[in-house]
Amino acid sequence: MAQALLVPPGPESFRLFTRESLAAIEKRAAEEKAKKPKKEQDIDDENKPKPNSDLEAGKNLPFIYGDIPPEMVSEPLEDLDPYYVSKKTFVVLNKGKAIFRFSATSALYILTPLNPVRKIAIKILVHSLFSMLIMCTILTNCVFMTLSNPPDWTKNVEYTFTGIYTFESLIKILARGFCLEDFTFLRDPWNWLDFSVIVMAYVTEFVDLGNVSALRTFRVLRALKTISVIPGLKTIVGALIQSVKKLSDVMILTVFCLSVFALIGLQLFMGNLRNKCLQWPPSDSAFEINTTSYFNGTMDSNGTFVNVTMSTFNWKDYIADDSHFYVLDGQKDPLLCGNGSDAGQCPEGYICVKAGRNPNYGYTSFDTFSWAFLSLFRLMTQDYWENLYQLTLRAAGKTYMIFFVLVIFLGSFYLVNLILAVVAMAYEEQNQATLEEAEQKEAEFQQMLEQLKKQQEEAQAVAAASAASRDFSGIGGLGELLESSSEASKLSSKSAKEWRNRRKKRRQREHLEGNHRPEGDRFPKSESEDSVKRRSFLFSLDGNPLSGDKKLCSPHQSLLSIRGSLFSPRRNSKTSIFSFRGRAKDVGSENDFADDEHSTFEDSESRRDSLFVPHRPGERRNSNGTTTETEVRKRRLSSYQISMEMLEDSSGRQRAMSIASILTNTMEELEESRQKCPPCWYRFANVFLIWDCCDSWLKVKHLVNLIVMDPFVDLAITICIVLNTLFMAMEHYPMTEQFSSVLTVGNLVFTGIFTAEMVLKIIAMDPYYYFQEGWNIFDGIIVSLSLMELGLANVEGLSVLRSFRLLRVFKLAKSWPTLNMLIKIIGNSVGALGNLTLVLAIIVFIFAVVGMQLFGKSYKECVCKINEDCKLPRWHMNDFFHSFLIVFRVLCGEWIETMWDCMEVAGQTMCLIVFMLVMVIGNLVVLNLFLALLLSSFSSDNLAATDDDNEMNNLQIAVGRMQKGIDYVKNKIRECFRKAFFRKPKVIEIHEGNKIDSCMSNNTGVVEISKELNYLKDGNGTTSGVGTGSSVEKYVIDENDYMSFINNPSLTVTVPIAVGESDFENLNTEEFSSESELEESKEKLNATSSSEGSTVDVAPPREGEQAEIEPEEDLKPEACFTEGCIKKFPFCQVSTEEGKGKIWWNLRKTCYSIVEHNWFETFIVFMILLSSGALAFEDIYIEQRKTIKTMLEYADKVFTYIFILEMLLKWVAYGFQTYFTNAWCWLDFLIVDVSLVSLVANALGYSELGAIKSLRTLRALRPLRALSRFEGMRVVVNALVGAIPSIMNVLLVCLIFWLIFSIMGVNLFAGKFYHCVNMTTGSMFDMSEVNNFSDCQALGKQARWKNVKVNFDNVGAGYLALLQVATFKGWMDIMYAAVDSRDVKLQPVYEENLYMYLYFVIFIIFGSFFTLNLFIGVIIDNFNQQKKKFGGQDIFMTEEQKKYYNAMKKLGSKKPQKPIPRPANKFQGMVFDFVTRQVFDISIMILICLNMVTMMVETDDQSKYMTLVLSRINLVFIVLFTGEFLLKLISLRYYYFTIGWNIFDFVVVILSIVGMFLAELIEKYFVSPTLFRVIRLARIGRILRLIKGAKGIRTLLFALMMSLPALFNIGLLLFLVMFIYAIFGMSNFAYVKKEAGIDDMFNFETFGNSMICLFQITTSAGWDGLLAPILNSAPPDCDPDAIHPGSSVKGDCGNPSVGIFFFVSYIIISFLVVVNMYIAVILENFSVATEESAEPLSEDDFEMFYEVWEKFDPDATQFIEFCKLSDFAAALDPPLLIAKPNKVQLIAMDLPMVSGDRIHCLDILFAFTKRVLGESGEMDALRIQMEDRFMASNPSKVSYEPITTTLKRKQEEVSAAIIQRNYRCYLLKQRLKNISNTYDKETIKGRIVLPIKGDMVIDKLNGNSTPEKTDGSSSTTSPPSYDSVTKPDKEKFEKDKPEKESKGKEV
C-alpha cells in the first residue's frame, strides 16, 4: 500500500499507456535483470514484493484514487500497482471502476497494445453491457437445456448461443492474447471452461461421434459460467475448494476405514445374501428320486444331477425359475434365510438354498470387495441401511448385529462428523482470514487518509487554521472524523462523498469503540514483513515515525486512551485474554520504528487494556459483527462522558469544545448521508405522510398514542396472536358445520382486531414513522394479505392465501426472545448463505440437467426392467422436474434406491459416477457448509443476549405490573391477618433485618479484602488482582443475593478473567494464601457454583488433604428435618446427649456407617443389575417356562424388600432433609414406590386391574437407578440436564415453526388422502372405475374407503407426518399421497397435483435442515458454556477418565525406558540390527498391505483355479510372517513378549498356521481365521509415525483416541435408554400384527429382538415401519380377538397413542440428544487435536526425544554425562534438534548438573522445550506437573540434588581461567621485577632472551583465553529473548541481572 503512495493517489495517478511507457518498462526490466544475480540468494519467497491486493484484476478501484477522467475510461493506462512497475502490463478501467489488467506484449504476435483492433476489443470487453449480454445468454441457454425433448427450431437457437460464445472468446483472445504471457486468455482457469465448451460445441456439430448425448451434457458446464460472471460466487467456490483440500486427510482415513470394514464384511458375509427360501419340489417330479444323490453332492459341471437311474432332474433350471422362491406380498425380492440357529427361518415346505441373484437387482451384496465397499459406504451415509441390516441379520444371524454397531458408531457417526468438523474449521479459518484482511485494509486506508489530509492541510490552510486542526487531530483520533469541503477538493467531490458515506458508519464505530485501540489491535496478525516495511514508509512520510501515536505521551491523552478502552465493547465471545499475548509479539515488528520509551509505554498500555475491558451487556455485537445504531449512539455518548470529565482543566476544556463541534459537523453529515432518497421525496413525505393538521387532531392523536403504546395493549395483542394461532390449529377433518362457522367468525374477529391495531398505530405514529420500523411493515403486510384473502376467499385455487395468516405467529417473536434470536440466526445465515444457496442451486441444476441428458432416454426405453407395468416410476430422469427431484433427494441423503433404478436402466458405471459426485459434492460439502454457517452464527452471545438493549419489552413490563398488583393485594391481606392474629411481628422483622445486615457487612468485608488484593502487584508489575478480586466478589453475591442475578443478568459474567487464566501465571504466594483464607471463610460455598462466568474453578484439594477431612464427615449424619419443620413441631428435635435420644443417635450413626460403606454400595448396584436383568426375561415365552416365571416372581419380591430396606436405612442415616433434597434419591424413592404398589396390589389380588398393569410397565424404569451409581453416566446426565433449558427453548421454537407447516398441511391436504381400495387384492382402484366416495360405497364389501395411516387430518397428525418427512423415514408414502390427492371424497390420481412436491421441498429446507441443525448448534453451544463453567475440562468425563485424557494429551509422563539390549552372540547381533531397522518395519507393513490386496481379490463365485492360486499366495504370506516372527524371536529373545504388538502378531501367526491344517473345523465352530488377518491392518497405524505427510491423519486418529472415554460414557447412557425402552416395548408391543417393519425376526417379542429394533431406530432408520403396525387400532386393520398360542393375551391391535409417544420420545432422546452429544464431543476433540498438532511440539516429538535418549542412556539411569550432551542434541529431530556447533547454546541453557557432571533427562527436555516454545507461565505450570508425575513414577530422582548448572560450571571454568591468567601475569610481573633488579648484573645475551620469553608467555596466555572469551560472551546473547516485547521492564531487568553479572565475571 505504501508503495502505491509513490504515485500520489487521486486523478494525477492515471497516465495513458503509450509507446514511451512500454519502452520505460522494458528499460526497468533490463536494469533489474542486471542487478539480480547478486541478490538472488537473499530474497526468500516471504520477502519478495507481492502484488497489491486492492489493485488485483477484477476488483474495483479503491476510493482513494478518486474519479477517472472521462477521456481515460476504457483506455489502456499505466499500471497503478508498483509491483508491476518492471513487468509488461497495463490496466484498463471501465465506468464502474473495475480494474482489468492486460499483458503489454503483442496479442497473437500481431496486435500491439496500441493496435486499433485490440483497442476496440478491449473497449468491448470491459464494457458492462458485454458481461450483461453474456449473463443473459447463459441464463436463456440454461432454460433451453431443461427441455427434455426440444422442438426442431431449437437447433437454430443452439447455433445462436454457440455464435455468441464464440464471439465472446474471440473478443477475449483479441484483447488479451492467447496463452503465452500472464493475463492472457488461457491463463485464467475460468476461461478453460469457456474454451472447452466452445470446442465441444463445434466437435459435436461437425464430427459424428455416435453417442452425442454424452457430449451434449458438457454443454451443462455453461451454467458454471455464471460463477465466473457473478463476483461473490467465486469466493464461495474458493471456500468450497479450500474445504475440499482440507478434507483430503479425512477422505483418506474414511476410505481406509471403509476398506477395512468392507474386508471384514467380505470375509463374514460373502455369498450370504443369496440364501433364499426355495419351495421343496412337488413329489411327482423326478426330484424326489434324486434328493439323496443331491445331498451326496454328485453334481456334474453344468449343474445337472447324474444318477444311476439316469432319470435327470434339471436342478439348475428349477433354481433359475423365480416362481419357486418364497416372496412376501409387496416385495420384489424373495425372502432371505440363513442356516444358523439365530438367522431367518423358512416357512413350512421350503428349504434354505443359495441360489439366484442378490437382492435389489443384485446390487446389494458382500460378494466382491467392490460391492462390499458400496454397502459400507451406504452404511456410512446411513441411507436405507435398515434394509441392509435386516437382510444381513436374516441371512447370517442376529449375533452379527455387533458388526453393524461398530460400523455405525465408528464409521458412520465418527467419520461423517469428522467431515463436518473439518468443513466447519475450514470455514472458520476462511472467515478469520477475510476479517483480518478487512481490518488491515481499514487501517491502511486510515493511514492514507491522514496522509492525504496532512498534505492538503499543509498546502492550503493558513497557519492559524492548521494549528487548530492539529489540535483536533491530537484528540485520540476523533479528529479523523473531521472532513471539511476544502479537504475533499483534491478528491473529486462526488467520489469523496460516496466514499465517506460508505465508510462513515464503520469509522465511527472504530473511533468511538476505543479511541486508541492498542496498537496490536490495529494491524491484525496476518502480516508479512513486507507490509511492515511498507508501513514504515507510510509513517516516515510525515518525517516522524508513528506520527499519529507519538502524541500519546501527553498525560491527558494517555488518560483518554485508557478511558476510551473502557468503553470499547467486547469484540465477541472469542476474543479472550489469551489473544493478547500472541498479538503483542506481532506488534514487536511495528515498535521497531518507535523509540524505546514510547514502545514500552504503548505496550504496557495495551496489556492493561486487555484486563480492564468491562463487560457491557448492552453492547454485544450481532453475530455478523456489525454494530447497531443504538450501540453507535451509546458509544458516542460514552465518549462525551469522557470529555465532560476532562473539562476540569483548561486544555481539556478547549479540546472537549472542539470534540463537540467536530461531532456536530459529523452528525450533520451523517444525517445527510443517511438519506437514501432524493429530496423531493422528503418534501412529499412531510406533506402527505406526517399528519399534523389541527389541534383537535393532535389531541386525538395523543390520546390514541397513549392507548396504543400502553404495555397492556401489547399484552392483549400478544394474547390475540396466541388465540388466533389456536383457532387456526383447531381445523381438522371431518369438521361439523357449527365448528367451521365458529372458526370463520373467529378469523373475521381477529382480522378486525389486527386491522384496528394497525390503523390506530398509523394514526398515533404517522405513516412516515410507522413504516420506519421493521415489525410494523411486517404487520402491515400481514394485515393487507388477510384483507385480500377475505375478498378472494371464494375464488377457486386461492385457498393458499389462507396460509399467509400463519405468518401472524411470527409476531410472537417481538416478545419472545428465543424465537427472535432464532429468526435472526436463520436470517443471518440466509444472508451469508445467499451465495452458497446460489452455488447449491447451480450444482443441483447442473446435475439435474446432466441426469436428464444422460439417463432420460434410458428410463424411457428400459422402464420395464424396474416397473412391471412398464410405466415410468415416480422417481425418474425423463424430464427436468423429476430429474431435479432425484437430485434433491440425493442431497437429502437418499441416493441408493434411485441409484439402483438408474443402474438397472442405464448401466452401472455412469450411474455410479454421477450419483457419487452428487453425493460427495452436494451432500457432504455443501450441506456441511450450510451447517458450518449455522453453527458459526450461533455464538454464545446470541443465546445469552436475547435483546439488543437491556430494556424490558412491553410484554415484560405489563406482566411485571400485574405481578406488582397481585403482590400488593397479597401483602394487604397478609397484613390484615397479622393485625388480627399476631401482636409481635416487629421482633421478627428486626431479627430478619439483622440477618440481612450481617450478610451485607460480611459481604462488604469480603469485598474490602478483594479490593486490597486488587492492587497486589505480581511479579510482572501489572495488576493481576482484578481476576482475584472480581471472582471473590462474585462468590459473595452468589451466596447471598440470588435475586440480583435475575434483575441484573450482567452480574454473572463480570469475571473477565479468573486467577488461573490470567496471562501472568506466576502469581505471588501471598496472594494465594489470602485466596485460600477467603475460601475457608466460606466453606459452605458449593464448588460448582464457584464462578459461573469464569473458566477457572477453585482448585480441588490435593488427595492427601481429602483423606484427612473425610473421617470427620463420616461420624456425623445431618439433621433429620428441615429447620422449618423443627420450628413448627419442636418435638422433632431430640437431644442426642442422653437417654432415648442417644440410642437413636447411635442407631443413626451405625446406619450411616453401613450406608457409606463401599460394600453396601456394591451390593446395591449388584441388586439393581440383577433386578434389571430379571425384567429382560419377561417376554412372550414366559408363560411356557413355568419355573422361570415363579423364580422371577419370588426374585421380584426379594428385590423389592431389599430396596425398601435400603431406602429406610438411608432415611435413618441421612435424615429426610438430605434424602429428599437429592434428585438421585428422589429417583430411587419413586422407583421403589412403583414396586411397592404393585407388590401390595398383587397381595390384595388386584393384579389384573388395568391401572396396576400399566404401573408394572413402569418397572422398566428400574435401570435408571444405575445412573447415579455409575459415575460415567451420571456425568453425561448432569451435562444433559444442564442443556435441557436451552434444548426445550429451541424445541418450542421448532414446534412453532413446524406448527405453521402443519396448519398449512391441514389446509392443503385435510381429508384428501382417502382412497378406495380393493379388499381382495389390496390394490387401489383406478379413477376410471371409482371416481369418488359414493362410487366406492356402491361396490359394497369388496371395496373400502380408507385413509393413509399418517396424514394431515389435524394438526397433531400433521406433526407426526412432518416428523417423518424431517427424518426422511416414511416420507415417500406421505409425499405420494399428497402429490396424487385431488379433493375431499375424490379418488386420488397418479401425480395429479405434481407441484405439491414443492411444499415438501420447502419444508425440508426450513423445517429439517435449519431446525434440526439448530439442535446440533444449541447442544454444542451449551456444552461449550458448561465446559467453561467446569473449568475448561471435558464435562463428559469422570475424574479417572480425565486423568487418562491428560496422559494422552501429554505423554511427558513417559520415562526413558531401558532399550532391549543387543545380544552378545554375533549371529543374533546381526539379526538384531536387521530387525530393529526402520526399513524392516516398513517392508513388513508393505507385506501386510499386499496380504490385504490378495484378500480383496477374493470373490464369492471365483473359479477353482483362482481359489487355488489365492490359497498358495496365502501360504507364502504365512511363511513370510512366520519368518518375521522367528527372526524377531531369535534377536529379541524373551523381550519379544514385552511388546503388545508382538504378542498380537504371534497370535495371528499361530492361528494362521493352525487354520491351514484345521480350516474346516475352525470355520465350523469359530470365526474364520482370515478375520484376524484383517485386524492386522491396525498395524498400519504404526507406520503413520514414520511418514511425515501423515500428520493430518494422525491428528484425526488422535482426536478419536481422545474422544473415546467420553464416547464410551455416552454409549453407556444410550445403552441404558435402549434397555429401558426395550423392556417397555416388550410389555406393550409384543403381540402386534406382523406387517410393514415388524416380522418374525424384527419385533418386540423378546428382549434381544427389541434391542435389535431399537438399535436400528437410534439413527431414526425405519421407525415408520415399526410404528405402522402399532397404528392399527381396530378391524379390519387388525383382529382384536386373535389368539396367540402359549399365551393368554388376545388380539393383535396396537395402541396408537402409546406407540407414537414411544417412538417419538425415543427418537428425540436418542437421535437428537445422544447422537448430537456424540457430534459435540467429536467436534470439540477435533479442534483440540488440531490445536495440539498445530503446536510446535507434539507427542511424537517427546517420543522421539526418548527414543534417542535410549541410545545415549542404555541403562535407563535417566542421566546423561555433560560431555555427551552436544552429540545428543545433534542427534534429535527438529524441532528439538540443536545442530552442531551447539556447545554455546547448551551452556547458556543453564542446565542443573548432579555429581559426576550428569544431567537429568527432564531438565534437558524442559530446556529444549523452552527453547522451542519460548518462556511463558504455562511452561512453568507444565514443568511442575511433569515433575510431579515423574517423581511419582520413579522416586529415584530425589536422591540426586543438583550441585551446579552448566552455565555455572562454564562460569566457574571461565573464572578459574581468569584467575589463573591473572595469577600467571602476577608471577610474570614478579619475575620481571626480579629480572630488572638483576638487570645490571646480566650480560647482553640474557637481556635479549628474557623479554622474548616473557612475550611468548603472554601470547600463549592470550591465545588460551580467546576462545573462552568468545564463548562466554556469546553465551549470554545466544538464546533469543522471546519476551522483549511481551514482558514488562521489571522482569526484564531481573532477567538481565544474572547475565550482566556473568558478563562482569568474564571480563
UniProtKB/Swiss-Prot annotation:
I repeats (start-end): 110-455
PANTHER family, A to Z: SODIUM CHANNEL PROTEIN TYPE 3 SUBUNIT ALPHA, VOLTAGE-GATED CATION CHANNEL CALCIUM AND SODIUM
Protein name as catalogued: Sodium channel protein type 3 subunit alpha
Annotated source species: Mus musculus (Mouse)
S-S bridge residues: C864-C870, C902-C911, C1316-C1336
Post-translational modification: May be ubiquitinated by NEDD4L; which would promote its endocytosis. Phosphorylation at Ser-1453 in a highly conserved cytoplasmic loop slows inactivation of the channel and reduces peak sodium currents.
UniProt gene name: Scn3a
An individual GO BP term: membrane depolarization during action potential
Catalytic activity line of the entry: Na(+)(in) = Na(+)(out)
II repeats: 693-965
Membrane-crossing segments per the record: 129-146, 153-174, 189-206, 214-235, 250-269, 398-424, 713-730, 739-763, 774-793, 798-816, 835-855, 908-934, 1158-1178, 1191-1212, 1219-1244, 1254-1272, 1286-1308, 1395-1420, 1479-1497, 1506-1529, 1540-1557, 1570-1592, 1606-1629, 1697-1722
Family stated for the protein in its record: Belongs to the sodium channel (TC 1.A.1.10) family. Nav1.3/SCN3A subfamily.
